[in-house]
């Protein structure tokens, strides 16, 4: 049986590993490599896929979305070799790293893609629930932000209903953070000024 000190050190190591991986700012890197400048200087100033899309390059936005998700998936799957607790720590670290990357002044994305990536790595069936909730909400409302919020809200409930309290707790915390990061979007939704999917400008 592992000593408590070793176990704690392993979890801290997994958290740090996840954070470093999650803090890679793919949106910023890809837009610069494509000669589109600093994505932080346009739109919302966010480094995530939605703001990258505002450059007009859909392929680059898709690549950003996939890579931001893979950060979470890779962190969780690699750390899973040391147990579920390590996987949870690494997944959470990747999520936090994406939100607050040390390399660019702790100003990162809103976390939805990495949230989904961590979910794929820890509970792929939960990712299907997320996708279904996102698609249904998007079809009904055409609000990308609302779709992400609803999907993230449904996930911990679904995980808890299947008896996975540890993962439900993790994603409940992550959902709260996602809501906090989307507070400007929530305000615009309430005011009726949030942009819809496919809207111009």
UniProtKB/Swiss-Prot annotation:
Q: Which residues cross the membrane?
A: 10-30, 60-80, 86-106, 116-136, 139-159, 166-186
**Reactions mediated catalytically:** an acyl phosphate + sn-glycerol 3-phosphate = a 1-acyl-sn-glycero-3-phosphate + phosphate
Q: What is the lineage of its organism?
A: Bacteria, Pseudomonadati, Pseudomonadota, Alphaproteobacteria, Hyphomicrobiales
Any one GO CC term of the record: plasma membrane
A GO molecular function annotation here is: acyl-phosphate glycerol-3-phosphate acyltransferase activity
Source organism (scientific name): Brucella ovis (strain ATCC 25840 / 63/290 / NCTC 10512)
Q: Which family does it belong to?
A: Belongs to the PlsY family.
Pfam families, A to Z: G3P_acyltransf
Assembly behavior: Probably interacts with PlsX.
Protein name as it appears in the record: Glycerol-3-phosphate acyltransferase
**Gene Ontology BP term (one):** phospholipid biosynthetic process
Instruction: Please name the SMART domains in this protein's record.
Output: G3P_acyltransf (SM01207)
